[in-house]
Amino acid sequence: ARAAAAGRTVRVIGVQAENSAAYPSSLAAGEPLTVQTTPTIADGIAVARPGDIPFEIISELVDEVVTVTDDDIARAILSLLERAKQVVEPAGAVGVAAILAGEGQASGPTAVILSGGNIDPLLLQRVVAHGLAASGRYMTLQIPLPDRPGQLARVSELLSIAGANVIEVLHTRHGQGLQISEVILQLSVETRGQEHRAHVISVLEEAGFHPRVVED
């Protein structure tokens, strides 16, 4: 914004969390508006109405405000951890989230501000797990099975053939909607991306099983 104010040829792009994005509609209307918000992991930038002074500054110096989802933000935090070895809070990672999501793309060199590292360790743990799931590298499956010997071994064999790595298994005979002769197999599985994840599910389905992905 300072470079833009100095008259340099700079395009400034703001980013908000999709669940609490007051600026796009406010800028379109030419005045601060109050919008309905829903919870977001980027609570540091969650505002229902822009302040009058920030709105005036952003209206003058920012070219565009784009939005990103919480899934986008989780993927950005995970990417920063893995590639840059940086711990960045959700509100501070929205710029990277926008680039990874293809929002507000610039035609030349692009700089992103990482504006904070204040993230609770437990939230970081959840965000990393969510980021892995959102990028297709981790999933939890529930599979109803006939209660007879060999079923667990068969599922394990199929997952091995598909190249998936099982990291946790829960086998239970108790669950809503289960028949007396059924069990539920729940597996936490590492995969290599969305295509591999879809392939793993397809291999199980082609073998006659009915896997269900358990969302976070």
Which residues make up each language-model segment?
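Beta-strand->loop->alpha-helix junctions that form or flank phosphate-binding loops
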Residues: 14-16, 67-69, 88-89, 167-174, ...
